[in-house]
């Protein structure tokens, strides 16, 4: 039996069914379109993802918001009421400051549940890299490692998860203010794809560019081989 309950957030970007199968509860972010909030439920509702992509096809740009302290409080309280200790691995602070809301909620609940532990860790990770870190923590939990052993592993490995990605559409970066309008237009016409990674604080860094998707894929794969332990002989997990 696991010594503690492991928890995460929907930005692990894997199907809800997978996290459920691993016994990992999830708190959902939301996205907002036309002032209407929709849960990022990781496909738990089979209509959710088709609806989201239909919005994008219609030219609607979603916005997101942080999970607030009250939502974290209710979520953590429900987990603590199951009677065990809780380790929550949060979405990286380089992408959102929601983790600060989680810290505040956890501090409040520690006073209400003095006989239990509630620990919150900033993953410094995003998307499937975040999911990979949580999955590794679940492996330790299932191997009957203690919460402290798992925390030590997460703290050591959160800066070793390598995120590598690219984009074929600069217009989303223009809307987010990361590139200027003219640069986005010219880049899109020329087929320029920025090559990106996360730095050790979990922030997006555009460090290179490629002309066309094939070149972007090739550069991405090459850089993954450079950073993987053992290079092309790496045989561990890799989440895409």
How would you label these PLM feature ranges?
Residues 50, 54, 70-77, 100-107, ...:
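N-terminal, well-ordered alpha-helical segments
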Residues 69-99:
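N-terminal glycine-rich phosphate/adenylate-binding segment common to multiple enzyme folds
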Residues 45-52, 75, 79, 123, ...:
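N-proximal short alpha-helices
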Residues 5-71:
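N-terminal glycine-rich anion-binding loop in soluble enzyme alpha/beta folds
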Residues 3, 11-19, 24-36, 87, ...:
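Mixed-charge interfacial surface used for oligomerization/domain docking
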């Amino acid at each position: 039996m696991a010594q503690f309950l492991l928890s995460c957030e929907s930005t692990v970007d894997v199907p809800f069914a997978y996290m459920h199968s691993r016994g990992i509860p999830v708190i959902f972010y939301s996205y907002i379109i036309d002032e209407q909030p929709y849960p990022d439920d990781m496909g738990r509702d089979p209509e959710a993802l088709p609806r989201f992509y239909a919005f994008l096809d219609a030219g609607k740009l979603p916005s997101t918001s942080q999970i607030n302290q009250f939502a974290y409080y209710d979520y953590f309280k429900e987990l603590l009421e199951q009677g065990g200790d809780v380790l929550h691995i949060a979405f990286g602070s380089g992408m959102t400051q929601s983790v600060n809301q989680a810290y505040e909620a956890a501090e409040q609940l520690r006073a209400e549940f003095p006989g239990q532990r509630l620990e919150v860790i900033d993953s410094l990770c995003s998307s499937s890299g975040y999911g990979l870190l949580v999955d590794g923590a679940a492996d330790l939990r299932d191997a009957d490692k203690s919460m402290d052993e798992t925390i030590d592993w997460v703290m050591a490995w959160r800066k070793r998860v390598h995120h590598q990605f690219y984009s074929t559409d600069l217009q989303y970066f223009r809307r987010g203010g990361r590139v200027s309008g003219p640069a986005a237009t010219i880049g899109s016409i020329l087929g320029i794809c920025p090559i990106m990674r996360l730095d050790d604080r979990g922030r997006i860094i555009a460090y290179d560019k490629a002309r066309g998707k094939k070149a972007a894929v090739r550069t991405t794969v090459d850089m993954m081989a450079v950073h993987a332990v053992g290079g092309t002989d790496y045989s561990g997990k890799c989440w895409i």
